[in-house]
């Protein structure tokens, strides 16, 4: 047992599907304390975060759309450990959210995807100057990390690979951050994939997907009924090797989210990817 005060946690995007899962997970963790729930949807303003997340009892934490005052409130509490904000919002707002949090000394744990490489580098520089930890994690599933590690191992033996990512039809960005990260991990191996065998012609633009790092193509599917799924398909003469990860419940991300909340306090810079803290 420890007498250390629990870590103050703000959830941004609290009314979303991932936000509600994070609220439940944080509320059930004895070393964490939900102190704020932010959401810009007017429909949910002033509702209790616990009730909105489906908990049996209210948490007495109202939903608010005021991010800056909440950051200031948590930053000013000198009796508690440094605060953490978990961000599952939107690609259009996440960059500003992260900069604001770092400016207040609040450690961001970011699951929102859609940041450009230039934005990530700028945030990394900002976090370095502030000596403040920040985690940007495209996918919090430990199973997805294992898939990516298996893909790295397989890439030593296959020259041809493509990625298919499938998500629910309310996902705003494509390709997914996880698919881009998977391609980046393979691209960092210093190997060029998919050597051209014929001159291809796309009868419809984009029919062959987008080209990511080192010639790896990514294909995106958006349909109702899906949550989050990814295939990495390797091909060679006479064989196909397929790696696939399926998410059937968003609860699968919560062990990774809780791990990130606890780990980010010890960081002094921006770290990208769950695999870096496992």
From Swiss-Prot:
UniProt keyword list: Amino-acid biosynthesis, Cytoplasm, Diaminopimelate biosynthesis, Lysine biosynthesis, NAD, NADP, Oxidoreductase
Pathway: Amino-acid biosynthesis; L-lysine biosynthesis via DAP pathway; (S)-tetrahydrodipicolinate from L-aspartate: step 4/4
SUPFAM superfamilies in UniProt: Glyceraldehyde-3-phosphate dehydrogenase-like, C-terminal domain, NAD(P)-binding Rossmann-fold domains
Positions annotated to bind NAD(+): 13-18, 111-113
Reaction(s) catalysed by this chain's protein: (S)-2,3,4,5-tetrahydrodipicolinate + NAD(+) + H2O = (2S,4S)-4-hydroxy-2,3,4,5-tetrahydrodipicolinate + NADH + H(+); (S)-2,3,4,5-tetrahydrodipicolinate + NADP(+) + H2O = (2S,4S)-4-hydroxy-2,3,4,5-tetrahydrodipicolinate + NADPH + H(+)
EC number(s) reported in the record: 1.17.1.8
InterPro entries with a match to the protein in the record: DapB_C, DapB_N, DapB_N_CS, DHDPR_bac, NAD(P)-bd_dom_sf
Listed Pfam families: DapB_C, DapB_N
GO molecular function: 4-hydroxy-tetrahydrodipicolinate reductase; NAD binding; NADP binding; oxidoreductase activity, acting on CH or CH2 groups, NAD or NADP as acceptor
Signal peptide, first to last residue: none
Superkingdom classification of source: Bacteria
Primary localization class, coarse: cytoplasm
Binding positions for (S)-2,3,4,5-tetrahydrodipicolinate per the UniProt entry: 168, 177-178
Class of enzymatic activity (EC top level): oxidoreductase
Protein family (similarity comment): Belongs to the DapB family.
Its job: Catalyzes the conversion of 4-hydroxy-tetrahydrodipicolinate (HTPA) to tetrahydrodipicolinate.
HAMAP family: DapB
Protein name per UniProt: 4-hydroxy-tetrahydrodipicolinate reductase
Naturally occurring in which organism (per UniProt): Nostoc punctiforme (strain ATCC 29133 / PCC 73102)
Primary gene name: dapB
